[in-house]
Amino acid sequence: MSVRSYVAMTCAGAVALSSSLAFAHVSVSSPGFANQSQLLTFGIGHGCEGADTSKLEVTIPSSVTSVRVVPNVFGPVEIKKDDAGNVTGVIWTNPQPRAADEMYYQLSIRAKLPDAPFTTVLFPAKQTCKDKDGKESVVDWKATPEEVAAAKEGEEPEPAPAVLIVPVRKLGWNKFTIKEKLTDLTAFDDAQIVWSGAAAYSSNPATKDQIKNEDGVTELKEIAAGAEVWVKY
């Protein structure tokens, strides 16, 4: 059975697009759609050395616009703006930190992401914690993916919350032009299959095996700038 036929038969088993929130650090729901307003939720997976989170300050990049803060469990928030009135940061303060680090918090905004498919937007965050004795500690979640990848043994840079931007799509086949070279194909992990010429990519293990065993088909590992791809969702 060909890869194309196999994918058509396994449509019902395709992975649906979902917002992921990591539980190991401060994260943000991802992916997000290019040039669209949507809910972005920051997840605070843990406090600091056993202390509860007392405050989270998130920097809003200039490419992210139309920011609105969603009511949250912490209560009133501080919204920082520049001289033009653009939101540059949001500060959530927990009025009653718990005596122990035992909560998973979610804090949300609604915002419009830039029209830049297959790029990543970072939201540097500063997490403040307060223990039962009132002692504060701070963690800066600001490292870029490049800094995290380049970290030496023993180094543990704190990654900034990141949103992977994907183009708006429809069910079925979609044709996209890649503007910049793409070496990380996880942007397509919710797709059934991606084709670029005679090369194909899928995050689905069964489809991946079909790609490897199909005559005349190679595994797609990166996509050149300017290349056209066909993606089935």
Positions of PLM-derived features:
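Boundary at the C-terminal end of the N-terminal hydrophobic targeting segment
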Residues: 22-24
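Low-complexity, serine/threonine/proline/glycine-rich extracellular segments that form mucin-like
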Residues: 29-71
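Short, solvent-exposed loop/turn segments enriched in Ser/Thr/Gly
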Residues: 35-40, 52, 105, 119-123, ...
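Extracellular adhesion/glycan-binding regions together with long Ser/Thr-
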Residues: 78-102
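Low-complexity, intrinsically disordered segments enriched in Ser/Thr together with acidic residues
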Residues: 95-119
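Extracytoplasmic/periplasmic copper-protein system
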Residues: 130-171
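N-terminal exported-region signature
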Residues: 168-233
